[in-house]
Structure formats: structure tokens, C-alpha cells
């Protein structure tokens, strides 16, 4: 009967008839021989007869094992078939001949000839190189040969069982052919060559021509000079689908620790710049409005990466369809096992169909995920580029509403989240497709019961709508609170030095912790809501199946085990997208929030483009022309910042701007730069501009890079600039001269050095117009005079120069002076003209004259007032010489980011787990998950056991009992899921909170040397990206790991219970999977680490750009900075791309192994004699096995991804382990509350360096500052003045020596006790975002009356009273809505409130005019008369009335005495310094000043 059925079915007969195999084999072998013969003839005609020697020589030099093994395999197969041919001839000669056996002999003959010809062809014609693959036709032949050999082996096994095989040698030949074919397939998928350099050519056809070879040679030569691009861009089809192009990098990762240089660049089509311009071209604007909506953002993102999205759509569709092949055939499979066979060899056909479907599913899923992640990388790249581009065009007044921390958050968190959404992009429509396919299969199995299944599914999805809305609300609030925290964190880190000097760091830490508390509140709601959604959807399959089976019972639809198992298989496949639904909903919500936030940011107004008319150099006689100009930082303010501005500046003029603090001087320069919005009037600027900001902006990088600022090196001009800016002497002190790396914001430079470097930067640009904003305030008098003479009057004598200054001695040389007051130009003219024409300038000159008179009086006065020189001030020449001879280690201050190597240690996991209740919940979570799996399997076993196999078998239990037991088991398993989800959420939340608190506490307790050596971007990276991973990603990854591991164990248990032989299959497969994981993880781990590290430069560059945007725009350097961000973007993208490619390389191989294991398990099941196993249980086992490859790949993928994500924990733990400063409070040595009462400071042999690898800055200071006296510290820029002050506050710990205040060694008391008892006005005035009140009294210790009193004393009272909100008037980030001088006065107000016994002024009045300086000095004399005041100043008038003067030179005390005594000695350095200062005020200034008197 079976034979007749086969004859009636021609397809089955055709497949099973062995005589057709030799015929097909002969045909294809003949075809191959003809093609190869044609190839040889064609090449011979082209003159390739003499190529044998060349190719053979190349072959001898081959170092690639694959190539040699391929030739050996071909030769072996040829020899084997020849031997088999002889043996078969001998056997047939002995036993007799027939037609079918003759066909086998011909097949062996032509097979031997084909393999011999291939071997000869490869040796003689195919040129091996490190870039080529085997010809495409040859590789296709090998793949077909492998498939043909596999099927032939199956048929010969069947014939052997029937004892119809001609010879057992043929069976052995088939086994060898399959093995060799598998190796050849693997070889043809490999890139040929070590190093895996980019293949610039399309794959060569089998017929190579001379022209193509010549082109190959030329292109390969060119490739040597090109950038190494990812092999993906030129990989062949089979290499693409198998990810074999990643193999060389994986191999390299096992041979060495991969560095960034080992990873190739992304393809040109995936570069940030190309994607960015595509994105920009697709981003449409509304008519008349540059408004970006979320829809337009999505549309532009789609068109940026449309190719990958469409390909992933195709693969997702193929995957979804292939998933449902097995459930569709499951009922047939169970019936087959029950003995109901429709045709002979039905089992082989079923197994083959299952196997092919799983192969297609495996291939489609891997390419689907890969393409989606590739698209995600591209989307992140364009979003980062777009946010950066917006930052380049954002005006200062817009940025005040969006701090740097918020903008960086958009880049680090929101852009990354949108990138991560690529995983879930297709899930919504796939879910619809899967439900549709599932309903078709269910209708086939359950009839009308499928409608109930659909209704239950719809009900589950409907029930998630309110939870999804809650999730969207929680997510939006979570991101908003994260922004607020990051804003405060960024501000605190940027100003950490002032926080530590004032003893405020713990107060700011508590503010950040409070903000984190708000964020944690929303995070807690978010994770628990997600846990609830997860519980509902994990319980959904059981609910849907119970509903469907219950409906069948009510509708009297008979339930057979085959149909039940088919339905369960469908539910299990449908379970995956339903399980993913909570994550999908969550990601959709999070992505929408992020898209809305980015769209809102991109909708901010750009810098006003029509406010200034830009003219090319030399096109106008006037370089700057303003007529009836009105400008305002806030265009909504009724009172403009600047009004009635009129002036014309011809080329080559020297313009000075002066005025009191807050009069609008800096705003006027900003208006010329186009930074202040124009309200009315006209502004024309002709030529290129260069700008020197009042607060120096220095990039992290080498000194040379800061000066060149993107221009090519012109050595002669470069040296002239260094000389004019007095930088040569500083460079000699730097460990690597101009190659020394400057820390972020120039943190390892003095204020004067930063100022001179940015002046050098401006000079080197050779611009037409130079704008200097108070450039001489941060340098000493001698250096200031030198800069004015060499720069403004020297190199720039033929340039247009506009400079703001408070040093009026630089005014007489100006061609035009503009005097400003209250935002108006009140006077304009030459020095002598305006001196006689108004009172505003007279007030400034009068104050300066008084200061000069005070200096003169000290020069001419006697030394009777204070002439005693302390013995402590004497430092012997021998000691100085001895200190100078001490070797000082030299090295860069800024260190490379820490990078762990090797696998993530077990201690990292241990520490992570113990952060939540000592790890007590982890075993409970595992037990609950195991219990869920047991109950879930039990419920399915129950259905398979009690339902009959066919209609003629009586059910074991009644329908109601069947459903009730199933519902009970399903409910119990659902409850376990709820418990597991809640416990996981609780654990993850606790760990995230503990990690955050510990890391931030250690960061804020770290010494300043940590912040000096660590760019802020690195810290922010951990506080944002790594913290987000710990908050949300890691808990779900650990849950997924537990779920996958327990599920796999359950599947193995189910299959092993049905047929124990299956366990034999799993042992080698699991071993192979484990080996692959170990082989993969070495490269993947380093790629993940490099990817994490590469984010920090991106964040750092972004942060630096935002802080220096005015300087960047003034130099027209936006294109260069845009190029830099694109380069950094590509650096991150290439590392991330190869990291996800490595993951897919692994997953493809694991899926392949799982598919083979699945197929072998099916072979075992169909091979077991009928009646040995229960068909229902066997079908159930297959149902579970359908998810085996998915679960196994998920397990390994989760393990690998978990290790990659644990790098975030590893990076945070690095900061938890950083050394802390000494204790804030030492109870045993706490000083009295009245300490210090006298304020006497004694310094003994003080030696200071900024790090063990850096040279000494202070080299053995010994002196005493008498209590109640005022001491001025002077010296050339970089001599160690500010370092001495930092040591006094223990910002820098002494390397040797000691400091005593009122007899107490400051090294023995707590830092808080020390710093809170001292007061300082720092060199760089700092204000924090908040209000006037919070800036003056951040600790909330004083009443409003006291604050107003302090404001009046520091000359800000009237200014604050004019503001509507008074003390609650807003202060923007870094006090950007206040002038630098006003910020300095606020710092003065702080110390007036604090009233400490010891006050340090570190260039406190550098940014104010002379009149304000005089008022400040009078205020200090009046309110700190009994205090010890130490003043560092470049203005001699600020220290000339001091009781003592300390002069430092190169870290040593040169002089220490009273000013009068030092001035008596005309040879003293101080006397010379005073003489230089007074001489810098021109005699014209003095004469003109006297006229006014």
C-alpha cells in the first residue's frame, strides 16, 4: 500500500527513488567541468599561459590554513571517489552488472574528475591574496554539494536499512562527503586573509579577465593608503548572512586585548556626516515657521536609515511566517507518532520541513536584529549631530532656559533611548501578524474556540492601556527629574573647587541626593508599574489558552491531544511577542518622551542671523559700524541691555571701552559679535573676528592645539606669538612644553596662563578685528604692560582692536575711548578730549589717580611704620639651591580614562548583588521562577495527559475537571510571576539607589587632584548613561537571564523525560555553545569597554563646546567643531557597530547549533518504535523544543549582554573606590568654636606638588602671617601664589612641611572645620543657578536683613533693589545673566556675611574697575580691620597698603617685608615691580589727571 501511495504521489516517488541521484550528480559534475574548461580556454586566449609560475609562487607563500585545507580536501575527495570507483568496479565485476549500478560508477567517475579539476583550478588559476574570496560559482557549488550530500546520506541510510544499498562503501563516502562539504561551506564563508582588510572589489566571477585583474592590482594599491573600513561593507552574500566577516576581529580578540585602533571604521554610507545631511534634507519646516514636530523627527530618522529599516522589515516578516510552520504541522506530527501515517517516509519529510523552517527562522531573526541595531546606531548618530548642531546655533538667552546638563542629557540619555527603541520598532505590526497567523492555526485546531482565544488576547492588550498611560506619565516625570539632577550635578562638578574652598560640597551633595530622591520616587513607580504590566502579560498565554479550551468545552468541540498540543505550540510562540509587549509599551512611551524632548529643544530660536550685516574683508572702509543700535539679552524685556549705540570704527583703529561694573561693556562686545539680539538700528561688521573672553575658555588638549585652534602650523609666526604673549618661560616650566596636555577648562593652569594662551590663540588667527574683554585683569602689571606693548601696539598695530579694560593706564594709547554707563555710551573721544568733557570718565580717572597717589606715597614715604622683618622669612640661598636641585618627576596631569581588562570579575557581580539587602532576595527570586516553570509545564502536561489522542479514545477526566485543574495551575504560575516581578523590581531599585548614593558620596569626597585629572564628561557619563543602565536595563537583564536559564532546564527535562536519548544530543551542543561564548566574550567585552570609554570624549567635547560657544562662533570655527563631533560620533558608532555585530556572530552560531540539536531530537523521536513513547508527550516535548534555539540564544546573548552592561557597574565601582580626602570632622581634634581668634598663620618648609608624577610647585616656603595684619602676595604669573592659597585650604595636601593657624596644625583637624573657619574670594568668581539669596547664603544661615546689609557693603544693594523679585531674582547657570564684575561682588558679599578671622583674596578685584576696587578695599579695611587678610593681586594699588608683602618666584620666597621697607631698597624685586606698574601709567595720564584737580 505504501508503494502504491508513493507511485501515486510523483513528488514523494521522485525524492525517494535512489536512481535519480546519480543522474543529477553526473549532470551537475559535467556542467562544472564544462564551465571550468571554458574558463581555462578564455584565460589562455588572454595570455594567461604563463601565470602558473606566479600563482604557484603565491600559493607557496600562502600562510592561510583555510586555503591549504580546501585544496587538500578537494584532492582527498577526488582520490576517495577514485578509490571507490575501483572498489565498486571490482565488486560489480564479482557480483554482476546492471543499469543502475553503471550509473553509480559514472557518478563516481565524474565526481572524481570534478574534484580533481577544482583542485587543479585553484592551484593553477585562482590567485590567492589576503583580500580575495573563492569565486562565487565555486562557493555556490560547495553549498549545493553539501546540501546534496546531506540528503543523499539520509536516502542511503534508508536504503541500507532496507538492505538495498549497492555497497557499504557508498555510505562511508556519504559520511565523509557531508563532513568535507560542511568544512568547505564554512571556508567559503570566511574572508580570505589575515588582518581582514577591506575588499574594495566585487566578488570575482569564476571567469577572471586580465582587465579585472589589473584593476584589482590598482585598487589594492590605492587601498593601502585608505582608511580601514569594516569588512561588512564588501562582504559577500554568504558572509553577510553568517556574519563571517566578523570572524577576524573575534579571532584577534582571542589573541590579544583589542584596542580602539584594531576596530575598523564604519562604512562611508553609515558615517555621521552623511547621515546628518540626509536627516537635515528630510527634516521639513512648517510654512513660515521653523517648527520641528515629533512626526517630522520620526520621518527624517526613517529616511536617514530607510535601507536597514526596510531590510529588517523583510527579515521580520520571513521570521514571523517561518515560526508558524511548526505549529501548523504539529497535529500531523502527533498523529504520525500515533501511527496514522499518510505515506512512506512521512517522518523524514516532516523532520526535514521542521529543520528547514527553523533554519530560515534562525537566519531571518539574526539579520532582522542586526539590521535594526545598525539602524539604531545610525539614528543615535544623527540625533547627537543634530543636538550638537543646535547647540552651535543656540543663542545665550535660549541656553539660559536649557542648561548644559540638560542638553548633554538629551545626547547621552534621550538619543541612546531612541537608538535602543530600534529593537522594538517592528513589534507592533509583528504582533498583529502573529495574532492573525495564530488565529488561523487555532481555527484549524479548535474551530470556533479560536474566537474566544482572540477575544482573550484582545482583552489582555486592552487591559494594558491604563497601565501604559501610567507608564508614559511616570517616564516623562522620570526624565524631567533626571534633567534637574544632571543640571545640578554638572554645575557642582564644574565648580567643585569653589565648593570645597567654601566647605559647601556636602550641602550640594545633599541637594543632588534630594533631586535623586524625587527621581527615585518616579523610578520606583515606573519599575513597579512595569512589573505589573509584565505580570499581566506573562500570565496572558495561560489566560488565553484557558479561555480557548473552556470555550471548546462549552461549544462541545472535542479536544484531542494533537490539537491541544498544536494550540499550545501556537500559544508558546505567541507568548514571546506578548511577553515583549510590556517592554515594547515601555520603550514606545520612553521613546515618545525622548522624541518630544528633542523636538522641543530643536524648536528653540536660533541665534539672530539678520541682526548683523557681515561684509568680506576689505570691502568697506569701516570695520564696525553701529547706528541707532538697541540690543537686549532678553528681547521680551521692556528695557534694552544697550540703547542709543552709535559709532564707526575704520580699519586699523585702537578702541578702548571703559566704565563701571555692570555698565554694559561686555554686552557691547557681544553685540558686535552678534551674540546679543538686536532690537533696532543697524550693525555692520567687515572682516574676520577674533575674540578674547573675560573668563578664559580653554579646551582640554595640548597647549599647541589651543593656540593653533584649527589653523596649520606656521612655525615662525607661532614663535612670534609665543614671544609676544610671554609664554616661552611658562612653556619651559611645563613638563612637555607646548605638547603638555591642558586639563578640562585649563584646570592645571593659572588664571594668567589661561588668559595669555587665549590671547595667543586670537593672535595666531591673524584676523581683521580683535575684541578683547578685559584681557589684562588676570595678569600681573609687568606682564600686562608687556602684552599691551607687544600685542596691541605691536603685532596688532595695523589691525582693528576693540578692548575693554579697567586698567586706565592703557587708555591714553587708544585712538578712541568709549565710556559706558547704564547701557549707553555716555562719552566718546580721545583721552584728553573726554577727560575734560564729562563726569563719568572723570570718576574713573579720579579713582585711578588716587590709587597711583597711594603707590607714590609709599615710594616716597619713610619705612617707620612697619620695618621689622621676621626671622621666619629668611630662606637661605643654600636651601633654595638644594630645593632646586631636587629632581621632580614630570608627567601629564590629565590621565587616560581607566579601562579594566579581561572579563568582568566575579567580585563585581558579588558587590552588585549584595547592595540589595545583602543579596537575600536573589535565591527567593530564583525559587519563585523555578516554581513558575514547574507549574507552567505541569499545566501543559495535564492537558497532554488527560486529553485523548483521537476521537475513538475515551477522555480520562470530565471536561470541567480538565479546565478547573488547568485554571488552578495557570493561576498559581501567574501568581509566581507577579511575586518574581515585584521582587526583581524591588531588588533592582534598591541596588540602583545604593550605587548612586555611594558613587556620588565618593565623588564629592574626592580630592581636587581627582577633578584636575578627570574631565567632567567622564563623571557625567557615569552619572547619566551608566546610572540609566543600572536603573532600568540591568534588573531586566538579570530577570531575563533567570527566565531563560530556568526555561531551558525545563525544556531539557521535558524532552529527556520523553526520550532520554535526547540528552546525548544536548551535551555536545551545550558544550559547543559554551565554547563559542568563551571564544566570543574576549573580543565582545573589550568592544563594550571601548564603546563605553568612547562616550566620554563625546560628552566632554559637547560640554566644552557649550561653555565656549561664543568664542567658537567669533572665530567662525563651527565647521571644524562640527567635524570633530562627527569624528567622535563615528568613533563611538564603529565600536558599537562591531560590538553588536560580534553579538550577532555568536547568536547565529548558537541558533545553528540549537537548530541542529532540534533536528536530531526529532530524528530520535521518529526513529523510536511505535508505542514506546506517548505521542502526546512527544508532541509536547517538540512544542517546548520549538523555542529551544530562541531560548538558548537568549540565554547566551543575555549572559554576554549582561557582562557588557555590568561594565557600567564596574565603571561606577571604580568611582566608589577612588581615594577620599581626609575626614571632614575629626572629633578628637575639633578646634574651639572661636578658632581662629588671632588669625596668625605659620608656614614651615612647605613643599607642594599637584601629583606624584608632577614637579614641585612650592619648594620649601617658611614664613609667618601675623594675626590681624594684611599681607599682599605678589609675583609673576605661575609663581605659586594660588597654589599657596589652595594648600592653606588643604585643596592640595603638602608633600612636606606644615601650616599652623593660631598654633593648630591644619593637617590634624577636619577639612570642614578648617574650610568653614576661613573665607576666600576666588580668582574666578562663581555663581550658581538659583536666586540671589541662595548664592549669598547657600547654607540658609542668615536673615534677609543681614543679606541686604552685605549687598549694600559690596555695592550691589541698589542694583538688586531695582529687580522685581529682589533677593529672589533668578541667577542662570554659572551666573551668565550677571557680568563678571558683578559676580565678583557677590563673592565679596559672601565673605561679608561669613565674617571669618582669616580672609583670602585671590585676584578678588581683577574684574572690576578701579573705582569699584577702591570701594572694595575700603569695605575690607572697615569690616576686616582686626582680621588676617591675605591678598593676591596684580594691581599694586591692591597690595601697596598691606602691612606685609610676600614676593614669590618659581615657588620660592624671594622677599618678605613691609611695603615701605622693600620700597626703600631700590634693588628689591618689589620695588622694581612697583616702578614698572607706575611707569606703565603714561606721563600723559598723570598730567591729564592733574588738570582735573
UniProtKB/Swiss-Prot annotation:
Induction context: By salicylic acid (SA).
Domain annotation ABC transmembrane type-1: ranges: 309-590, 922-1204
EC number(s) on file: 7.6.2.2
Tissue: Ubiquitous.
UniProt keyword list: ATP-binding, Membrane, Nucleotide-binding, Phosphoprotein, Repeat, Translocase, Transmembrane, Transmembrane helix, Transport
Chain positions with Phosphoserine modification: 888
Coiled-coil segments: none
Compartments, as annotated in UniProt: Membrane
Residue stretches spanning the membrane: 21-41, 70-90, 102-122, 140-160, 165-185, 309-329, 343-360, 423-443, 448-468, 535-555, 915-935, 959-979, 1038-1055, 1059-1081, 1153-1173, 1177-1197
Gene Ontology MF terms in the entry: ABC-type xenobiotic transporter activity; ATP binding; ATP hydrolysis activity; ATPase-coupled transmembrane transporter activity
Residue intervals of the ABC transporter domain: 624-847, 1241-1475
Main function: Pump for glutathione S-conjugates.
Protein name listed in UniProt: ABC transporter C family member 7
Amino acid at each position: 500500500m505504501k508503494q502504491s501511495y508513493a507511485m501515486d504521489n510523483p513528488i514523494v516517488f521522485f525524492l525517494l527513488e535512489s536512481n535519480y541521484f546519480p543522474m543529477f550528480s553526473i549532470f551537475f559534475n559535467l556542467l562544472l567541468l564544462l564551465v571550468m574548461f571554458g574558463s581555462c580556454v578564455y584565460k589562455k586566449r588572454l595570455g594567461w599561459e604563463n601565470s602558473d609560475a606566479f600563482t604557484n609562487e603565491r600559493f607557496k607563500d600562502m600562510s592561510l590554513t583555510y586555503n591549504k585545507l580546501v585544496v587538500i580536501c578537494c584532492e582527498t575527495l577526488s582520490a576517495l571517489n577514485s578509490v571507490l570507483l575501483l572498489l565498486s568496479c571490482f565488486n560489480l565485476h564479482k557480483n554482476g552488472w546492471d543499469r543502475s549500478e553503471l550509473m553509480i560508477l559514472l557518478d563516481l567517475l565524474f565526481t572524481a574528475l570534478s574534484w580533481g579539476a577544482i583542485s587543479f583550478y585553484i592551484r593553477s588559476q585562482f590567485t590567492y591574496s589576503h583580500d580575495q574570496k573563492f569565486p562565487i560559482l565555486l562557493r555556490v557549488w560547495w553549498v549545493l554539494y553539501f546540501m546534496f550530500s546531506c540528503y543523499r546520506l539520509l536516502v542511503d541510510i534508508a536504503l541500507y536499512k532496507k538492505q538495498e544499498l549497492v555497497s557499504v562503501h557508498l555510505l562511508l563516502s556519504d559520511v565523509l562527503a557531508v563532513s568535507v562539504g560542511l568544512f568547505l561551506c564554512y571556508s567559503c564563508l570566511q574572508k580570505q586573509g589575515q588582518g581582514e582588510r577591506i575588499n574594495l572589489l566585487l566578488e570575482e566571477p569564476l571567469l577572471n579577465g586580465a582587465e579585472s585583474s589589473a584593476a584589482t592590482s590598482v585598487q589594492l594599491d590605492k587601498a593601502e593608503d585608505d582608511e580601514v573600513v569594516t569588512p561588512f561593507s564588501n562582504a559577500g552574500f554568504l558572509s553577510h548572512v553568517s556574519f563571517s566577516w566578523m570572524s577576524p576581529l573575534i579571532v584577534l580578540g582571542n589573541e590579544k586585548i583589542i584596542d580602539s585602533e584594531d576596530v575598523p571604521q564604519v562604512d562611508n554610507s553609515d558615517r555621521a556626516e552623511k547621515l546628518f545631511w540626509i536627516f537635515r534634507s528630510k527634516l521639513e519646516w512648517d510654512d513660515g515657521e521653523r517648527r520641528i514636530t515629533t512626526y517630522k523627527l520620526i520621518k527624517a530618522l526613517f529616511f536617514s536609515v530607510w535601507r536597514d529599516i526596510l531590510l529588517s522589515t523583510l527579515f521580520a516578516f520571513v521570521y514571523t511566517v517561518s515560526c508558524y510552520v511548526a505549529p501548523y504541522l504539529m497535529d500531523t506530527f502527533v498523529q504520525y507518532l500515533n501511527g496514522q501515517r499518510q505515506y512512506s517516509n512521512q517522518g523524514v519529510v516532516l523532520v526535514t520541513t521542521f529543520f528547514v523552517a527553523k533554519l530560515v527562522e534562525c537566519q531571518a531573526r539574526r539579520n532582522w536584529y542586526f539590521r535594526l541595531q545598525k539602524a539604531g546606531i545610525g539614528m543615535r548618530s544623527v540625533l547627537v549631530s543634530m543636538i550638537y548642531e543646535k547647540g552651535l546655533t543656540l543663542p545665550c538667552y535660549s541656553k539660559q532656559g536649557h542648561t548644559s546638563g540638560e542638553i548633554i542629557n538629551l545626547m547621552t540619555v534621550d538619543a541612546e533611548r531612541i537608538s535602543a527603541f530600534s529593537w522594538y520598532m517592528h513589534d507592533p505590526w509583528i504582533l498583529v501578524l502573529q495574532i492573525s497567523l495564530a488565529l488561523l492555526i487555532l481555527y484549524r485546531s479548535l474551530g470556533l474556540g479560536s474566537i474566544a482565544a482572540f477575544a482573550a488576547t484582545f482583552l489582555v492588550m486592552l487591559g494594558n492601556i491604563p497601565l501604559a498611560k501610567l507608564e508614559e506619565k511616570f517616564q516623562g516625570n522620570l526624565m524631567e527629574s533626571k534633567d534637574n539632577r544632571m543640571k545640578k550635578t554638572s554645575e557642582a562638578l564644574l565648580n567643585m573647587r569653589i565648593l570645597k574652598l567654601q566647605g559647601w560640597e556636602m550641602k550640594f551633595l545633599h541637594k543632588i541626593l534630594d533631586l535623586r530622591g524625587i527621581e527615585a520616587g518616579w523610578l520606583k513607580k515606573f519599575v513597579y508599574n512595569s512589573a505589573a504590566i509584565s505580570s499581566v502579560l506573562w500570565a496572558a498565554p495561560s489566560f488565553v489558552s484557558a479561555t480557548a479550551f473552556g470555550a471548546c468545552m462549552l461549544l462541545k468541540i472535542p479536544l484531542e491531544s494533537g490539537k491541544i498540543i498544536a494550540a499550545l505550540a501556537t500559544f508558546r510562540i505567541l507568548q514571546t511577542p506578548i511577553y515583549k509587549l510590556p517592554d515594547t509599551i515601555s520603550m514606545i512611551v520612553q521613546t515618545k518622551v525622548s522624541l518630544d524632548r528633542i523636538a522641543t529643544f530643536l524648536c528653540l530660536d536660533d541665534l539672530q542671523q539678520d541682526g548683523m550685516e557681515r561684509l568680506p574683508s576689505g570691502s568697506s572702509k569701516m570695520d564696525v559700524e553701529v547706528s541707532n543700535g538697541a540690543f537686549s539679552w532678553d528681547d521680551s524685556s521692556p528695557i534694552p541691555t544697550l540703547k542709543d549705540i552709535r559709532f564707526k570704527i575704520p580699519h586699523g583703529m585702537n578702541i578702548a571701552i571703559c566704565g563701571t561694573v555692570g555698565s554694559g561693556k561686555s554686552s557691547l562686545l557681544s553685540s558686535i559679535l552678534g551674540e546679543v539680539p538686536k532690537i533696532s538700528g543697524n550693525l555692520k561688521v567687515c572682516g574676520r573676528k577674533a575674540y578674547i573672553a573675560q573668563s578664559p575658555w580653554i579646551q582640554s588638549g595640548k597647549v599647541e592645539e589651543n593656540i593653533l585652534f584649527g589653523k596649520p602650523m606656521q612655525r615662525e609666526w607661532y614663535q612670534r606669538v609665543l614671544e609676544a604673549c610671554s609664554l616661552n618661560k611658562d612653556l619651559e616650566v611645563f613638563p612637555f612644553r607646548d605638547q603638555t596636555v591642558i586639563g578640562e577648562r585649563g584646570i592645571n593652569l593659572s588664571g594668567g596662563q589661561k588668559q595669555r594662551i587665549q590671547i595667543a590663540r586670537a593672535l595666531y588667527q591673524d584676523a581683521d578685528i580683535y575684541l578683547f574683554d578685559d584681557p589684562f585683569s588676570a595678569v600681573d602689571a609687568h606682564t600686562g604692560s608687556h602684552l599691551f606693548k607687544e600685542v596691541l601696539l605691536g603685532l596688532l598695530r595695523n589691525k582693528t582692536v576693540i578692548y575693554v579694560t579697567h586698567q586706565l593706564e592703557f587708555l591714553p594709547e587708544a585712538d578712541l575711548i568709549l565710556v559706558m554707563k547704564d547701557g549707553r555710551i555716555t562719552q566718546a573721544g580721545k583721552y584728553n578730549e573726554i577727560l575734560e568733557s564729562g563726569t563719568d570718565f572723570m570718576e574713573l580717572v579720579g579713582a585711578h589717580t588716587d590709587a597711583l597717589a597711594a603707590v607714590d606715597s609709599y615710594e616716597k614715604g619713610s619705612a617707620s611704620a612697619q620695618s621689622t622683618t621676621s626671622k621666619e622669612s629668611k630662606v637661605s640661598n643654600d636651601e633654595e639651591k638644594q630645593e632646586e636641585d631636587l629632581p621632580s618627576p614630570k608627567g601629564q596631569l590629565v590621565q587616560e580614562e581607566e579601562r579594566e581588562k579581561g572579563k568582568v570579575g566575579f567580585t563585581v557581580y558579588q558587590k552588585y548583588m549584595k547592595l540589595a539587602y545583602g543579596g537575600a532576595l536573589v535565591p527567593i527570586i530564583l525559587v519563585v521562577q523555578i516554581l513558575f516553570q514547574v507549574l507552567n509545564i505541569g499545566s501543559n502536561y495535564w492537558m497532554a495527559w488527560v486529553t485523548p489522542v483521537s476521537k475513538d479514545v475515551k477522555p480520562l477526566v470530565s471536561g470541567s475537571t480538565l479546565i478547573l485543574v488547568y485554571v488552578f495551575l495557570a493561576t498559581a504560575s501567574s501568581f509566581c510571576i507577579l511575586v518574581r516581578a515585584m521582587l526583581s523590581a524591588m531588588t533592582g531599585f534598591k541596588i540602583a539607589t545604593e550605587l548612586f548614593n555611594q558613587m556620588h558620596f565618593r565623588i564629592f569626597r574626592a580630592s581636587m587632584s581627582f577633578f584636575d585629572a578627570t574631565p567632567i564628561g567622564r563623571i557625567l557619563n557615569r552619572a547619566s548613561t551608566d546610572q540609566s543602565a543600572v536603573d532600568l536595563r540591568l534588573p531586566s537583564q538579570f530577570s531575563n537571564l533567570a527566565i531563560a536559564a530556568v526555561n531551558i532546564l525545563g525544556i531539557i527535562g521535558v524532552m529527556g523525560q520523553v526520550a532520554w536519548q535526547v540528552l546525548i544530543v544536548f551535551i555536545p551542543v551545550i558544550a559547543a555553545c559554551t565554547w563559542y561564548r568563551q571564544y566570543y566574550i574576549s573580543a565582545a567585552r573589550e568592544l563594550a569597554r571601548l564603546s563605553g570609554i568612547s562616550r566620554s570624549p563625546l560628552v566632554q567635547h559637547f560640554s566644552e563646546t557649550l561653555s565656549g560657544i561664543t568664542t567658537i562662533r567669533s572665530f567662525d570655527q563651527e565647521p571644524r567643531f562640527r567635524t570633530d563631533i562627527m569624528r567622535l560620533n563615528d568613533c563611538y558608532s564603529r565600536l558599537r557597530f562591531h560590538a553588536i555585530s560580534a553579538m550577532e556572530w555568536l547568536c547565529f552560531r548558537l541558533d545553528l547549533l540549537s537548530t541542529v540539536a532540534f533536528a536530531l531530537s526529532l530524528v530520535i523521536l521518529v526513529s523510536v518504535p511505535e508505542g514506546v513513547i506517548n505521542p502526546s508527550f512527544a508532541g509536547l516535548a517538540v512544542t517546548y523544543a520549538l523555542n529551544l534555539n530562541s531560548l538558548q540564544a537568549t540565554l547566551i546573548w543575555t549572559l554576554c549582554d549582561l557582562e557588557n552592561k555590568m561594565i557600567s557597574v564596574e565603571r561606577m565601582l571604580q568611582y566608589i573606590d577612588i581615594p577620599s580626602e581626609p575626614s571632614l570632622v575629626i572629633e578628637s581634634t575639633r578646634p574651639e568654636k572661636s578658632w581662629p581668634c588671632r588669625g596668625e598663620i605659620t608656614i614651615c618648609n612647605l613643599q607642594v606638588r599637584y601629583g606624584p608624577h608632577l614637579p614641585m610647585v612650592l619648594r620649601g616656603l617658611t614664613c609667618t602671617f601675623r594675626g590681624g595684619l594684611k599681607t599682599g602676595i605678589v609675583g609673576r604669573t605661575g609663581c605659586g601664589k594660588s597654589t599657596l592659597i589652595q594648600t592653606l585650604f588643604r585643596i592640595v595636601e603638602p608633600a612636606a612641611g606644615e601650616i599652623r593657624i593660631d598654633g593648630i596644625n591644619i593637617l590634624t583637624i577636619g577639612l570642614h572645620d578648617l574650610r568653614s573657619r576661613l573665607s576666600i574670594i576666588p580668582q574666578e568668581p562663581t555663581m550658581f543657578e538659583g536666586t540671589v539669596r541662595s548664592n549669598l547664603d547657600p547654607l540658609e544661615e542668615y536673615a534677609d536683613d543681614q543679606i541686604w546689609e552685605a549687598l549694600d557693603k559690596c555695592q550691589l544693594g541698589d542694583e538688586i533693589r531695582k529687580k522685581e523679585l529682589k533677593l529672589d531674582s533668578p541667577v542662570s547657570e554659572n551666573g551668565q545673566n550677571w557680568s563678571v564684575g558683578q559676580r565678583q561682588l557677590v563673592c565679596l558679599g559672601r565673605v561679608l556675611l561669613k565674617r571669618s578671622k582669616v580672609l583670602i583674596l585671590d585676584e578678588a578685584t581683577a574684574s572690576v574697575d578701579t573705582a569699584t576696587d577702591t570701594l572694595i578695599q575700603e569695605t575690607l579695611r572697615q569690616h576686616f580691620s582686626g582680621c588676617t587678610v591675605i591678598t593676591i593681586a596684580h594691581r599694586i594699588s591692591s597690595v601697596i597698603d598691606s602691612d606685609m608683602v610676600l614676593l614669590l618666584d618659581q615657588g620660592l620666597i624671594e622677599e618678605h617685608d613691609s611695603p615701605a621697607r622693600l620700597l626703600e631698597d631700590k634693588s628689591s624685586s618689589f620695588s622694581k615691580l612697583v616702578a614698572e606698574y607706575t611707569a606703565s601709567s603714561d606721563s600723559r595720564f598723570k598730567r591729564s589727571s592733574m588738570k582735573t584737580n
